[in-house]
């Protein structure tokens, strides 16, 4: 599936995109509120400024994904792979990041404490 098809199906009311492969997808400023991307492959995807509040990204592969200024309020990112991801200025209020993994290359906003969110450093 590509970004265009995802957005078209989302606009038609579909919300369940479990395990979809959207590696390197360009979803800048996409409106995907409440979308289910459980186990999705979003490696290298550009989700900058995306509206993902309430989204289910449990177990998603977000390696090297750009989530700069994305709205992830209330999103589920449990066990997500955030190695090398960019989350600068991302809104994470109420997001569940427990068990999500990150590394020294993962970029968070200043003052964000991954340990307080029960994240795992790998």
Regions found by a protein language model. Name each.
Residues 2-122:
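Tandem repeat scaffolds
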